[in-house]
Amino acid sequence: MSLFSANGPEDVTRQQEALGSEGTPSTEAPTGEEHEAPRRRVPHMGHALVFVAFTGLLLILLELVLVAMGRAPGAVHGGVAKLLHPKMQLAMLAATYLTTLLASWFFFPQLWQRKFLEGLQWRWPAARNQAGRLIALGLMLGVMVQIATNFITPPKSRPIDAFFLTQADAWLITLFGTIVAPVFEEVCFRGFLLPAFAIAYDWLSLPRTAEARSRWQTTTTLTPAALIFSAVLTSVLFALMHATQVAHLWAALLVLFTISLVLAFVRVKTGSVAASALVHGAYNGFVFLVVIIQTGGYRHLERMTQ
């Protein structure tokens, strides 16, 4: 059985009941609700597209509202992100992320016929039980990335530098980067996109036979090939999403790609999006901690360029 089931624990139980004790098809005829076929695999590609599209449209809407309010004159020509104050940019992103999560909390259960966190496989208890190891993994990942960056020539300027112009802005981006961003990005990439791409891969590679269709309808596990394909594809997208933050440096993008692969592995290994979010938050927290120490608690931000 794959470590990554497309549904919750109840579905895994139903799947196991439909199989013999040695993992072979049971010869007993299904009776009653105990042998009910598993529910549909979620989140699939349609669900992921809705989530991503809603996020993008909401972000654009907020940008247009800011332009209409006159907070960013000329933004239509120069781009909102370049003209808004860092605090306004963070507020816009935080509002987009939190609103999307809130809307998803109520919307997707109507499609999935189960609670949002169950369909997403958030599974906080699994992450909590391994919190020490997950945080340690995130910190170790941060150390390795810091070592790797010593061999990367940094760009003269990066868009993210705009968030470190004042001490207040620096603390705001730290809070956002260690709490809000990791949770949202893990929900998006490891909660929606990872299973969606894997489900699509398995469906497209499914033999068009009655036996294969029956197996698809009565199981919810994903094949290793599908998980590997999805982990690579989502990691490419993850790196590209952060490309502007690292000035599109190929070496830095490769580092981000590797980080995403580790997060995907954690997600699959633990079966918990909360677990990968914990690793992600610990990693981001370590990166910010290095800067905090370097700048004396953000009191000497000029040291970042030295």
Ranges and model annotations:
Residues M1-W122, A127-R128, N150, A282-Q306:
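N-terminal, membrane-interfacial amphipathic/helix-forming hydrophobic leader that caps
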Residues A48-L49, L90-A91, A131-A136, W171-L175, ...:
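Hydrophobic alpha-helical transmembrane segments
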Residues L61-L64, V232-Q306:
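Functionally important transmembrane alpha-helices
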Residues M69-L90, W112-F184, I199-T221, A225, ...:
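Juxtamembrane helix-loop-helix connectors linking adjacent transmembrane helices
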Residues A94-T99, Q167, W171, L175, ...:
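Membrane-embedded alpha-helical segments of multi-pass membrane proteins
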Residues S104-P109, V145, T149, G177, ...:
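Structural signal for membrane-spanning alpha-helices in multi-pass inner-membrane proteins
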Residues W105, G191, P195, L261-A264:
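Transmembrane alpha-helix boundary and packing residues in multipass membrane permease domains
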Residues G191-D202, F288-Q294:
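Membrane-interfacial alpha-helical segments at the cytosolic side of multi-pass membrane proteins
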